[in-house]
Regions:
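N-terminal cap/lid segment of alpha/beta-hydrolase-fold proteins
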Residues: 387-424
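Secondary-structure transition/capping motifs at alpha-helix termini
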Residues: 283, 379, 422-424
């Protein structure tokens, strides 16, 4: 009897296993896993200031390259790559013809490429690249004493594009040491020549430039990892300590200046609950809260896309992306609302805009859409589809994701997402 019972259990187990395997086979046949893990066609994308070109990063096998497309017909005018196991950490248009990019490399067993701190400039018309910052800079060797750029063991990151000066940018530069003091330098994007414009009394600094091109705020931390925020009234003024985390018990990170330069917007920790965006009156030193959500931190800050690059709002993610603005009178607010109406059910974001403000590059994504890029003409109010991140995936064939929440036994609200079967 025991043997017969055991046989029945084994038969039932085998049948259940076969049913489970059959279900898995059906599921595998229904879902093309390869199409979902395949790398996207385009990652970052930006319009040139004049609106003639579109720059984009292309992940390809063991490297990520840069391609420049002519906007009128999307034909490539230039391509650039640094070779095997290299990536592009960031890039930005310096002017209508030159693109600056930060170099990253995949080293050893690292899962992600590591930023090397080197800066390269690429010509948008012929794709020629030249290293301007880093140890591998070609400075002409020992045969010349005139060296506009120099090979140096430093890392650099873009601090500001200086829209009013097409030939210069501000870089955040620091040496490769255990105790780095950063400095702000103005660099000529044609020659690579750099001039120090600011030194600061805090390590690991990040610089904030005002709308006149002056470095006026800096955020950093010393060896105790406690942050400090400094401000100065002008390029000639002394740095003034605005916040010290050791005494205030909160971090205040500078986001940007108001259009008139009199207010510094901050993202601040709060004693309880989510972070807030504060407005610091630089004359009086008074802080006022301008934007805060009841449940979630700001996901990203929204900046004005034309004129002075001032913070005007934030994007929050409490289930689905939504935008809130504290400068409700800014013209960009109306543009954001129009785009949200035009792409109802999706999340449109202004990726970049031409210097005259007419053309805007808009990225649209959702729970079922990996990302579509559109060219939006603000004069005609017409949008033209350019490219998709994953053109082989049809959003209509994707399963929707629904935000869900429930309260745990200890009273904690738990938030998550539920992926629904297609048609379910």
């Amino acid at each position: 009897m025991q043997d017969k019972g055991m046989a029945r259990v084994l038969r039932a187990g085998v049948c259940a296993s076969l049913v489970w395997l059959g279900m898995c086979a059906v599921a595998s046949a229904a879902v093309d896993v390869e199409s979902h893990v395949r790398r996207e066609e385009f990652s970052q994308m930006q319009l040139s200031p004049g609106g003639d070109y579109l720059a984009a990063t292309l992940p390809r096998g063991d490297r990520t390259g840069l391609v420049i497309l002519r906007l009128s017909d999307l034909k490539p005018t230039a391509q650039f790559s640094l070779g095997r196991n290299t990536d592009i950490a960031w890039f930005s248009w310096a002017n209508d013809r030159r693109v600056l990019l930060g170099v990253a490399e995949k080293i050893g067993m690292l899962a992600r490429p590591r930023f090397t701190g080197e800066v390269v400039v690429v010509d948008a018309q012929d794709g020629r690249g030249e290293m301007l910052v880093g140890e591998r800079v070609d400075d002409g060797g020992a045969g010349t004493r005139i060296k506009p750029k120099k090979a140096e063991a430093v890392w650099a990151r873009l601090a500001d594009e200086l829209p009013g000066d097409p030939n210069s940018v501000i870089l955040n530069v620091a040496p490769f040491t255990d105790d780095p003091y950063s400095r702000a330098e103005r660099m000529d994007v044609r020659s690579g020549r750099r001039v120090v414009v600011a030194r600061v009394p805090v390590r690991n600094a990040e610089f904030l430039v005002d709308h006149a091109g002056v470095v006026r705020a800096v955020f950093g931390s010393n060896t105790d990892n406690m942050s400090q925020l400094y401000h100065r009234a002008s390029a000639e003024a002394e740095w003034q300590l605005v916040n010290d985390e050791r005494s205030s018990r909160r971090r205040e990170y500078p986001l940007g200046f108001s259009a008139d330069g009199r207010t510094l917007f901050l993202r601040s920790d709060m004693p309880r609950g989510p972070d807030a965006i504060l407005a610091l009156d630089l004359a009086s030193g008074q802080r006022s809260e301008v934007l805060r959500d009841d449940d979630v931190d700001p996901m990203t800050v929204i900046y004005a896309s034309t004129g002075p690059r001032e913070p005007i709002g934030a994007r929050f993610m409490d289930g689905r992306p939504r935008t809130e603005f504290f400068n409700k009178d800014h013209p960009d607010v109306r543009l954001h609302r129009l785009l949200e109406q035009a792409f109802e059910g999706e999340s449109p974001e202004l990726a970049s805009r031409t210097a005259d403000g007419r053309l805007a590059l808009v990225e649209v994504h959702s729970d079922r859409n990996s990302g579509d890029f559109f060219l939006f003409d603000t004069a005609t109010m017409q949008a033209r589809h350019l490219v998709s991140r994953r053109s082989w995936l049809d959003p209509l064939e994707m399963s929707p994701r629904r935000p869900v929440s429930f309260t745990a036994r200890d009273g904690l609200a738990v938030h998550g997402y539920l992926t629904l079967p297609k048609g379910g």
